[in-house]
Amino acid sequence: EKPDILVFLETNLWWEQKLSPLDEVFPYSLKCLKENLYGMHVYSRMILNDAEIQYLVDKEIPSMHMIVHMPEGLRIRLHCLHPVPPSPTESDESTDRDSELLMVGKSIADSELPVILAGDLNDVAWSATTRLFMKISGLLDPRRGRGFFSTFHSHYFFLRWPLDHVFHSQHFMLKSLRRLPDMGSDHFPVMAELVYAPVHGMQQESLEKEKSDEVLAQKKMDMTDSAAEDVHTPGGQKKS
């Protein structure tokens, strides 16, 4: 496989040392190593700038926001997330996860630039929260109509869930989406190939947003101290 961009999650110092050879192949990167299972590393063959690591709802949970410069001059917003799951050992409720996802989604909805969002969202594609995120952001799920692509848990074939996601704006068409073989992690890697084709891409239908969706999303976002306006907007362009 020869991807243009690699996104690694749950990275720590050990992982950073093991991933260091990638610096020779991927000259641009954004790294945030943490020992709490929420580290994040992004490697790119293309220039990354206007990049920022943020802690939107939790001082220990990073997210990454950046511009990817394509060789032909195209600029793409890339957002990488790994929100906290609802669980007895992490967070009893899904408040933080939902709020972070929806805040980023609302900031994306105003973007004039093409957008890709990737990460372990600790939620399945058909959940109410994921569907609400898609309505608020306007992004598309390339899996729709193509299968589940369950990525967790790689060690238990009888119990797997699609927790790792790639969403994209209507500027793109999907060329291929694959779950790659087990590489030793408890998550399978995912490979997505997107083609910039805005004329054809705009024919793809996103989920329709209603006023009640906006009200519910705002209610969830109000449960934290941050707001959609706090999300870094790489490229600085918004629809008028």
Please provide the spans of the model-predicted regions.
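Active site of divalent-metal-dependent phosphoester/diester hydrolases
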Residues: 27-42, 60, 124-184, 188-189
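N-terminal, active-site-proximal structural segment of metallo-dependent hydrolase catalytic domains
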Residues: 1-20, 200-240
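Acidic/histidine-rich helix-loop elements
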Residues: 87-94, 155
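Residue-level detector of structured alpha->beta connecting loops
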Residues: 2, 45-47, 112, 138, ...
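Structured beta-strand-rich core segments of catalytic domains in phosphoester-bond hydrolases
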Residues: 5-83, 180-181
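Alpha-helical scaffold elements lining the catalytic groove of polysaccharide deacetylases
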Residues: 92-102
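Solvent-exposed residues in well-ordered beta-strands and their adjoining turns
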Residues: 69, 195-197
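Active-site beta-strand/loop signature of hydrolases that rely on acidic residues for catalysis
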Residues: 1-17, 77-81, 100-133, 167, ...
